[in-house]
């Protein structure tokens, strides 16, 4: 029981730390202090690090995390902020786990499509109600979901991706 109690405390402290960080980032976005530390960044390496970091954590929760890539064909180095990009990947993976329902599986893929790198994260949950889909990237929007969270993460992700001249799309 002590071990289980410690596991719960660690998980909750991680959740609260993430929420505080999201609130701080939201505040920085609002007052213009949100900056990128741009350097040559291997986009797929950052994605692979996030997948690797979450794979074991998800496995412990009974969620399979699968990753596929055509990385052998090319390397995608961009001018970007590796920490912010990894933050996007981690936030999206966390959302997929929270909202994946009984699907218990998340698929991540990375591929070059025309002149863009396309990264897809797919969960097998019930999806977002169609009437809520246009609002999910708005700050503080939580919709009808009962899942934990601040409603800030996807808005921050959208801003980070936009500042990297990318697009952040969410669909069912």
What positions do the PLM features span?
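Short conserved segment of the HATPase_c
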Residues: 128-140
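Short alpha-helical segment of the dimerization/phosphotransfer core of two-component systems
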Residues: 11-16
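Short conserved segments within the C-terminal catalytic ATPase subdomain
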Residues: 57-68
């Amino acid at each position: 029981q002590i071990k289980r109690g410690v596991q719960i405390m660690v998980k909750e402290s991680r959740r609260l730390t993430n929420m505080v960080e999201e609130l701080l980032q939201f505040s920085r976005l609002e007052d213009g202090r949100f900056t990128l530390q741009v350097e040559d960044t291997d986009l797929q390496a950052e994605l692979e690090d996030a997948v690797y970091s979450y794979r074991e954590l998800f496995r412990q929760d009974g969620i399979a995390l699968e990753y596929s890539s055509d990385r052998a064909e090319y390397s995608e180095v961009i001018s970007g902020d590796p920490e912010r990009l990894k933050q996007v990947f981690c936030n999206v993976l966390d959302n997929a786990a929270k909202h994946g329902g009984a699907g218990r599986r998340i698929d991540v893929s990375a591929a070059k499509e025309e002149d863009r790198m396309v990264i897809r994260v797919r969960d097998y949950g019930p999806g977002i109600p169609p009437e809520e889909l246009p609002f999910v990237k708005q700050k503080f929007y939580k919709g009808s979901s009962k899942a934990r969270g601040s409603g800030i993460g996807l808005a921050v992700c959208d801003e980070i991706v936009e500042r990297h001249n990318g697009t952040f799309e969410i669909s069912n």
